[in-house]
Swiss-Prot record:
Ligates lysine onto the cytidine present at position 34 of the AUA codon-specific tRNA(Ile) that contains the anticodon CAU, in an ATP-dependent manner. Cytidine is converted to lysidine, thus changing the amino acid specificity of the tRNA from methionine to isoleucine. One of its GO terms (molecular function) is ATP binding. The gene is tilS. Belongs to the tRNA(Ile)-lysidine synthase family. This is tRNA(Ile)-lysidine synthase. The keyword tRNA processing applies. Keywords: ATP-binding, Cytoplasm, Ligase, Nucleotide-binding, tRNA processing. InterPro entries: Lysidine-tRNA-synth_C, Rossmann-like_a/b/a_fold, TilS/TtcA_N, tRNA_Ile_lys_synt, tRNA_Ile_lys_synt_N, tRNA_Ile_lys_synt_subst-bd. The N-terminal region contains the highly conserved SGGXDS motif, predicted to be a P-loop motif involved in ATP binding. It catalyses: cytidine(34) in tRNA(Ile2) + L-lysine + ATP = lysidine(34) in tRNA(Ile2) + AMP + diphosphate + H(+). The lineage of its organism: Bacteria, Pseudomonadati, Pseudomonadota, Gammaproteobacteria, Thiotrichales. It is an enzyme of class 6 (ligase). It is found in: Cytoplasm.
Length: 398
């Protein structure tokens, strides 16, 4: 199957974006995507993320910049810091890239982020998730489209193979760079791409297409499952708390899936299999006062007949005087202490940051400002007249 430029363009136009943001590495995938997308009468911004790992990374950045100048497209480059010690580079870099993309997207009314993932990427991701022992959500792989907090991300080339993309580039004389670090098998994805996939192709020459189809089936099944679970979760919840007596009426497998969904909906984080098993055991033998630390940030408690998410730190751990002193220094107005409320952060808390037109979830702001996860647990929410006016010790809202 050859790439249909008209189909790709029509798919992008279907979302009626105000602006198009392209993750542009200079490789063949993003170069083809840029070449096609530039034909749209929609403002386009190409973003190059410099990982500072390869000797030629600056040359690649210049290549991308010159290509954008040639087509009169806006170009933005962003340089990543060194990966924190002990973290996986692949996972860390992916989070950093997406955080920067979303930071740029916040500037526009209805942005659409385009990424150049293709069928072979999907097949590799399926294998990576299978090796990890992932469930349906993981095996679903890379989503074709995903709604973001502000805008969405679309992968128009996901149904096309790498060979088809390279063929399109050759046919249309599209210049692109080649990253020889893609051959380095110390990275798991490269090992799968360069050694495992070729072996599987001996069994099934169309293995990438087959695995991609399996990922799509898993995605469809997971979507159905999540809708059914969400409906059931609503019937056994009270605000953000889970009613234990209603939960334990259900089959064990449904209980475990609901525990995972409940925690993720309220924290945007996933429970590990071991934690789900421990929680499942606890709710079926409930004891008021039981608790488990999920991370440095969250705890889950049993209180009477409810499962409750709490935060390990409390206001007493930080001097209220310190918080008020910080607020006085940073807020350019008189403070009526009788109207000030200080509490822990909640998952849905939002803040209108530095003159923005509308508020953003704190999780998004923490990512944009690159506040380490380990530091976020210190956050205290300061309210006045039931409105968030500051997040101690990080920033003022409004």
């Amino acid at each position: 199957m050859s790439i249909s430029k008209s189909l790709v363009l029509n798919e992008i136009k279907k979302f009626s974006p105000s602006h198009i943001i392209i993750g542009y590495s200079g490789g063949v995938d993003s170069s083809v995507l840029l070449n096609i997308s530039k034909e749209l009468d929609i403002p386009l911004i190409a973003i190059y993320i410099n990982h500072n790992l390869h000797r030629d990374s600056l040359k690649w950045q210049i290549h991308c910049q010159q290509t954008c100048q040639k087509y009169n497209l806006q170009f933005i480059s962003h340089s990543l810091d060194k990966v924190p010690k002990g973290e996986s580079f692949e996972a860390w870099a992916s989070k950093q890239r997406m955080a920067f993309f979303q930071k740029i997207m916040q500037q526009y009314s209805k942005p659409l982020l385009l990424l150049g993932h293709h069928q072979d990427d999907q097949a590799e991701t399926f294998l990576i998730q299978a090796i990890r022992g992932s469930g349906l959500a993981g095996l679903a792989g890379i989503p074709h489209y995903k709604e973001l907090h502000h805008g969405g991300v679309l992968r128009p080339l996901l149904k096309y193979s790498k060979i088809e993309i390279e063929g399109f580039a050759k046919l249309n004389n599209i210049s692109y760079i080649y990253d020889d670090s893609n051959e380095d098998i110390k990275y798991r994805r490269n090992l799968i791409r360069n050694q495992i996939i070729p072996i599987l192709q001996q069994v099934n020459p169309n293995i990438s297409q087959t695995l991609s189809r399996s990922a799509n089936i898993c995605a469809e099944s997971n979507n159905i499952l999540q809708k059914l679970l969400t409906e059931r979760l609503q019937s056994i919840s009270q605000d953000t708390n889970l009613i234990i007596s209603e939960l334990i009426k259900l089959d064990d497998d449904i209980q475990k899936n609901l525990l995972h969904l409940w925690f993720k909906q309220n924290t945007q984080q996933s429970l590990k299999s071991k934690q789900i098993k421990e929680l499942h055991l606890a709710v079926n033998n409930p004891s008021t006062g039981w608790q488990i630390d999920i991370s440095n940030y969250y705890q889950i408690h049993i209180q009477y007949n409810q499962l409750i998410i709490k935060y390990p730190t409390t206001i007493n751990d930080i001097s209220k005087e310190d918080i008020i002193s910080w607020l006085s220094k940073n807020l350019n107005e008189e403070i009526d202490l009788t109207k000030i409320v200080i509490r822990d952060r909640k998952p849905d808390d939002k803040c209108k940051y530095r003159g923005r037109n509308k508020p953003n979830k704190l999780k998004i702001l923490f990512q944009e400002l690159q506040i380490p996860t380990t530091e976020r647990s210190k956050a205290k929410i300061i309210l006045k007249d039931q409105q968030i006016i500051a997040v101690y010790p990080f920033f003022i809202c409004g």
